[in-house]
A protein has these predicted regions:
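N-terminal Rossmann-like NAD(P) cofactor-binding subdomain of oxidoreductases
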Residues: 1-203
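Single conserved hydrophobic/aromatic residue that forms the stacking wall/gate
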Residues: 205-217
């Protein structure tokens, strides 16, 4: 029997990509999806490339929780905590693609994301979801914080060289640049092509996560 997976925030960039990945997953099936902006609309009306999912309609969050074994949240930072509590209380697994559960320290979370922990005990249940390093810790857990892009690509690229003794762990520099899909679909001047083309913008928020998770020792 396949795992029933629901997606909250399925019409954002991350959510839409998750739809694509889960439709091809041999052990999972999408049970329900939700979208605040497109509730009641077909996903294929939002993304014509998903015409093969013509009968998949965006519902509300409660429907996703009710119909699913595991709920993925592809929401902006700060919007996953209440939903996570609801899912855990209902005995469902919850995987957050945002940053709400990535940092163990509330002080650091407030510093970088401007929010607070709504339930500290809930945060204590969260496990960092990078299976290449933490597979044993993730097994059986109900609340998983999906790692961000920098904390995924950098350690996974470096680890084979370190494990095989090809490089020293001292003096490693990760020179990273990212695109703007992580900023979401909502248009704004900062994400407008003429503002971004051939330019770089310093984003210190990405420092918080890699420096708080010792992935390689």
């Amino acid at each position: 029997m396949k795992i029933k997976a629901g997606i909250v925030g399925a019409t954002g960039y991350a959510g839409a990509e998750l739809v694509r990945l889960l439709t091809a997953h041999p052990e999972a099936e999408i049970s329900a999806i939700s979208s605040v902006s497109f509730e009641g609309d077909k996903l294929s009306d939002v993304y014509p490339s998903y015409t093969f999912l013509n009968d998949m309609v965006c519902e509300n969050q409660d429907a996703v929780v009710e119909k699913s074994d595991v709920i993925f949240a592809a929401l902006p930072h700060g919007l996953s905590q209440e939903l996570a509590a609801k899912c855990i209380d209902a005995g469902k697994a919850f995987i957050d693609l945002g940053a709400d559960f990535r940092l163990e320290s509330e002080e650091e979370y407030t510093e970088w994301y401007g929010g607070t922990f709504l339930d500290k005990k809930l945060h204590e249940q969260a496990v960092y979801g990078l299976p290449e390093f933490f597979r044993d810790k993730i097994k059986g857990k109900k609340l998983v914080a999906n790692p961000g892009c920098y904390t995924t690509c950098s350690p996974l690229a470096i680890a084979p060289a370190i494990v095989n003794g090809l490089v020293s762990t001292k003096g490693i520099i990760c020179d990273c640049k990212s695109g703007v899909t992580g900023a979401g679909r909502k248009p704004n001047q900062g994400n407008h092509y003429p503002e971004l083309n051939e330019g770089f913008h310093l984003s210190l928020i990405h420092i918080s996560e890699p420096t708080r998770h010792s992935l390689i020792s």
